[in-house]
């Protein structure tokens, strides 16, 4: 009887200790989550405020819901609306994603499944480029595209992805492919599959989580890219969303409509958020 009571007491203490620890962890996580998400909450609230209310009220809840910032912000002060800017953005973001996935998968397949001369040296060079700042190559690339007469087009933004210029994605896909057993390749070879068939019918279905992760990363990076379009795109008619938002901050008139800028900034966040939440399951797996 005494032994049973002792075990029960130990169990109660253990359970109490676990509950206190869990309460502390969840409280800490909740506080951190609120701190991280507060800027987004404030951004959403500020899109419905007037300029004066944005700078005079610390409350993120607007005094009244007003969609005027969204309407006027979408129209802009030019002859182009944000419809044009979003179309421009997707017109080079989507090709970048497709070419990046194709080229990165092919390069990763070569490194993960084939042996060839100087393989380790080539892989080392590939990994070394991960530590090379992209700004280092801006001037040489600008001169190249200028000599080719391709400035003020989206070609300088899209073309590098054809040649697997994202070593991070290549490295991630290589590691994912190495986790797939090679006996699947051998079985497919016995059944008459060639190398391309093994890639398309065996490896690609297994690579789905990794490919979706690459898609999310590339979409966010390309959609938010400011420096690339700023260097290569000069025509207002071809501006992406990132440049259009900067254009909206017009100091020449003396008045900056921050509520409109924040409204368009929130709309610019939505595509990436929607993509992430739709593919969250595969992103975690990848």
Question: Where does each model-flagged region fall?
Answer:
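A structural signal for multi-pass alpha-helical bundles of membrane permease subunits
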Residues: 4, 13-17, 21-286
């Amino acid at each position: 009887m005494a032994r049973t009571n002792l075990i029960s007491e130990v169990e109660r203490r253990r359970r109490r200790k676990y509950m206190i620890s869990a309460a502390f962890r969840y409280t800490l996580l909740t506080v951190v989550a609120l701190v991280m998400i507060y800027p987004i909450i404030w951004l959403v609230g500020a899109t419905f405020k007037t300029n004066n209310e944005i700078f005079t009220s610390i409350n993120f809840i607007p005094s009244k819901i007003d969609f005027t910032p969204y309407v006027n912000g979408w129209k802009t002060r030019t002859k182009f609306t944000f419809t044009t800017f979003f179309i421009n953005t997707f017109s080079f973001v989507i090709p970048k994603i497709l070419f990046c996935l194709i080229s990165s998968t092919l390069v990763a397949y070569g490194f993960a499944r084939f042996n060839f001369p100087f393989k380790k040296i080539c892989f080392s060079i590939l990994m070394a480029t991960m530590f090379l700042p992209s700004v280092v190559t801006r001037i040489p690339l600008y001169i190249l595209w200028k000599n080719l007469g391709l400035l003020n087009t989206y070609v300088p933004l899209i073309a590098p992805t054809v040649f697997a210029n994202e070593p991070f994605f290549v490295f991630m896909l290589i590691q994912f492919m190495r986790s797939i057993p090679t006996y699947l390749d051998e079985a497919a070879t016995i059944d008459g599959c060639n190398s391309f068939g093994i890639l398309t019918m065996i490896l690609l279905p297994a690579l789905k989580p990794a490919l979706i992760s690459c898609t999310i990363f590339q979409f966010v990076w390309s959609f938010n890219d400011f420096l690339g379009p700023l260097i290569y795109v000069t025509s207002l008619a071809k501006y992406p969303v990132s440049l259009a938002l900067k254009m909206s901050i017009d100091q020449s008139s003396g008045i900056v409509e921050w509520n409109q800028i924040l409204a368009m900034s929130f709309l610019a966040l939505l595509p990436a958020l929607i993509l992430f939440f739709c593919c969250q399951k595969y992103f975690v797996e990848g």
